[in-house]
From Swiss-Prot:
GO terms for cellular component: plasma membrane. This is Serine protease HtrA-like. Residues 680-733 form the PDZ domain. Belongs to the peptidase S1C family. It comes from Staphylococcus aureus (strain MRSA252). The keyword DNA damage does not apply. It is a single-pass membrane protein. The chain crosses the membrane at residues 410-430. GO terms for biological process: proteolysis. Residues 1-388 are annotated as: Disordered.
Length: 769
């Protein structure tokens, strides 16, 4: 950097010296301003701060002038020192060493006295303020800190100065400055300590002081440490360097152990301040390397930036020296005692300096570093995330370790649990199946009982074969055919079998072929038959023990919808023992039957309706309930187009009454009143007028003929009488009249009839015997 008068220094050295100069000057001004205006509000303080920045340009000019004067004086001192060295080299080696030592000692003590005088003047100046102690200690601390900074950078600066002085740069700026004043303040504390140390030696102290006074009058030139290093290219002597390190170690030890927390707070505050004014500066070396290529003469940056970087660099240097001097504390314990009072003073000055820095920052109105706060929040969030990840990793490691230690036991435990679940499911399924099987068994038991009873019924049903000329099944069929039917063994006495069947099955033949379920056949004899009930009894003899008589049930307790089985031999022997299933479809049915095949119904048969399959050959077969008991005998079936499963059976209670008479008598005696009748529904209009029928009479019978001396004649019936009621029951036709009369075949008592004669209603009693 060219600062005029052919003085050239490196950019980095120029900037560093400029920062140090501005830092020391601004620190003194700010401390004084704080003491004078501590009771003024923030507005006034901000105005004062702005005035300081306005004066920074003047400071910049003063620095250049001071530095220029200093460099001129240094060149003169260098030339004089070279001349003295050439003279001293001509003498003896011992004399040269003595003179050189005395010269250095005298120059150093002269600087010490000058610094003492300057300190005295400063102390008088600061006593005028209300808090002189605070300002003095803060200034001493700053000066000692600057001295340590300069001593740490002296090697780098010396080489750079020597190199740049020989080769000036074309782009450097011209600056004139007197650096002597700034160096005097920075070296005063070190020289004062040396004088105090020498004064304790007694006589040696007085002699040295006199020499210093005499040399001072002669104006012996004093070289600073940096100048001496530039000329001689040698560091400080070993005793001086050791004393300097001891003093710095004692100060750092007191600061570190007593006010560690305050320094950490100050460091965080200055780091926040640094983020407002300058980019991040890691150390002085990197900063100098950047400054070698960038020239920045902004006064504001030079005022604010050095104070922050200076404090950071001082702390780094103090920490380094503190670590190095810990190993020397035992050897230097005696000397350390002498510096305890000075350490206490340094501690107090450090505390006051920190307070002053904080007040200065408040006066400057610096805003908090929001970027640093954001970075701190981001760091906290990152640390929480890392802790969460670490926790998860710890859990994973614990689980993995647990698995590696106990995996065989865990596998066995899991297998046991799975086995228990499977067995439980199996047992539940088995129990469910058992319950279902129980229900099925109950149904199966019933069904098995039914089948057992059906099998027994099959053993009681036989085939009855007879040749007949006509088929009496409904509908009427005039074609002659071989009649094949079924019969039921209702009674067995020894080897004698009593079989009930239909009258139209046996026909007119006395002997019938009886075939059993085991295909054995015998010839049976007809004991009796009744065409009005369509029942017949056949007697047969057989020693076959497989033939069983059937159990008799009760037809009076039949229930609509009751399950039934029909056992018979449809279509003959080839399909004997056929069992069909159905229900009772109807009760108390009156079925018209044509026995003589003259296309005129002869009788109303009282029966119950079933829907089981009945085919030709089932006539005379058994109708049994679920218990296998006989409840009826198949009698008829309606054979008409579009009609299915409409069959009828004679109730077993009626069958029992008839078969008893057929066994003993061979026939059934019915009462005969001796009349012939016509149905009113079949009369034409002339016949209706002849009998003088009223319009309201729709149903009934008209007496067409009366036998002489018959029961009807004896009862008073006449031809032309219209009977509408008999025995309290309405008459629909002549079949119903015969049915009511035959129903009294057992008691033969007289019954009341309601008649119309000559259009007049009348009642008469009809005799049945």
């Amino acid at each position: 950097m060219d600062i005029g008068k052919k003085h050239v220094i490196p950019k980095s050295q120029y900037r560093r010296k400029r920062r140090e100069f501005f830092h020391n000057e601004d620190r003194e001004e700010n401390l004084n301003q704080h003491q004078d205006k501590q009771n003024i509000d923030n507005t006034t303080s901000k105005k004062a701060d702005k005035q300081i920045h306005k004066d920074s340009i003047d400071k910049h000019e003063r620095f250049k002038n001071s530095l220029s004067s200093h460099l001129e004086q240094r060149n003169r001192d260098v030339n004089e020192n070279k001349a003295e060295e050439s003279k001293s080299n001509q003498g003896s080696k011992s004399a040269y060493n003595k003179d050189h030592y005395l010269t250095d000692d005298v120059s150093k003590k002269q600087n010490s006295l000058d610094s003492v005088d300057q300190d005295t003047e400063k102390s008088k100046y600061y006593e005028q303020n209300t808090e002189a102690t605070l300002s003095t200690n803060s200034t001493d601390k700053v000066e000692s800190t600057d001295m340590r900074k300069l001593s740490s950078d002296k090697n780098k600066v010396g080489h750079e100065e020597q190199h740049v002085l020989s080769k000036p740069s074309e782009h450097d700026k011209e600056t004139r400055i007197d650096f002597e004043s700034s160096r005097t303040d920075s070296d005063s504390s070190m020289q004062t300590e040396k004088i105090k140390k020498d004064s304790s030696d007694g006589n040696k102290s007085s002699n040295l002081k006199s020499e210093v006074i005499s040399d001072k009058s002669n104006s012996v030139p004093i070289l600073s440490e940096s100048d001496d290093e530039v000329n001689n290219q040698k560091p400080l002597t070993l005793p001086e360097e050791q004393k300097l390190k001891r003093q710095q170690s004692q100060n750092e030890q007191t600061k570190t152990y007593t006010y560690g927390d305050s320094e950490q707070n100050d460091k965080s505050n200055h780091e926040n301040d640094l983020s407002h004014h300058t980019p991040s500066i890691s150390d002085d070396k990197d900063y100098v390397m950047r400054e070698d290529h960038i020239v920045d003469d902004n006064p504001d940056n030079d005022i604010n930036t050095p104070s922050l970087s200076k404090i950071d660099d001082d702390r780094k240097l103090d920490e380094k020296i503190h670590v190095e001097d810990k190993h020397k504390q035992n050897a230097d314990s005696s000397e350390t005692v002498g510096y305890q009072s000075q350490s206490s003073a340094s501690h107090r000055s450090t505390e006051k300096r920190n307070m002053a820095i904080n007040d200065h920052d408040k006066l400057n109105g610096q805003k908090p570093n929001t970027k640093t706060s954001a970075n701190n929040n981001q760091k906290k969030a990152t640390s929480k995330l890392n802790k969460g990840r670490a926790t998860n990793n710890n859990y994973s490691a614990i689980l993995k370790k647990f698995w590696m230690m106990y995996w065989p036991k865990l596998v066995i435990l899991m297998g046991i649990i799975i086995l228990i679940v499977i067995l439980n499911a199996i047992f539940n399924n088995v129990n469910k199946n058992d319950r279902m099987n129980d229900n099925n068994d109950a149904d199966a038991q019933k069904y098995t009982t039914t089948m057992k009873n059906a099998n027994n019924a099959v053993k009681s049903v036989v085939t009855v074969e007879n040749e007949t000329s006509k088929d009496s099944s409904l509908p009427k069929d005039k074609a002659s055919q071989d009649e094949v039917g079924s019969g039921v063994v209702y009674k067995k006495s020894g080897d004698t079998l009593y079989i009930v069947t239909n009258a139209h099955v046996v026909g007119d033949k006395e002997n019938q072929k009886i075939t059993f379920s085991n295909n054995k056949s015998v010839v049976g004899k007809v004991l009796g038959k009744d065409k009005w009930s369509d029942l017949a009894v056949v007697k047969a003899t057989s020693s076959d023990s497989s033939v069983k008589e059937i159990a008799i049930g009760d037809s009076n307790n039949l229930v609509l919808g009751e399950p039934i089985l029909v056992v018979g031999n449809p279509l003959g022997v080839d399909f004997k023992g056929t069992v069909t299933e159905g229900i009772i479809s109807g009760l108390n049915r009156n079925v018209p039957i044509d026995f003589d095949k003259d296309n005129k119904y002869d009788m109303l048969m009282k029966a119950f309706q079933i829907d089981a399959s009945v085919n030709p050959g089932n006539s005379g077969g058994a109708v049994v309930n679920r218990e296998g008991k006989l409840i009826g005998v198949v009698a008829a079936k309606i054979s008409m187009p579009n009609v299915e499963n409409m069959s009828f059976a004679i109730p077993v209670n009626e069958v029992q009454k008839i078969v008893k008479e057929l066994e003993t008598k061979g026939k059934i005696d019915y009462p005969d009143v001796g009349v012939k009748m016509k149905n009113i529904a079949s009369l034409n209009s002339f016949e209706r007028q002849a009998v003088k029928l009223l319009g309201k009479v729709k149903n009934g019978v008209v007496v067409d003929q009366v036998d002489n001396n018959g029961l009807a004649d004896q009862s008073g019936l006449k031809k032309g009488d219209v009977i509408t009621e008999l025995d309290g029951k309405l008459l629909e036709d002549d079949l119903r009249f015969r049915q009511i009369i035959f129903s009294h075949k057992d008691d033969l008592k007289s019954i009341t009839a309601k008649i119309y004669r000559d259009g007049k209603e009348k009642e008469i009693n009809i005799k049945l015997k």
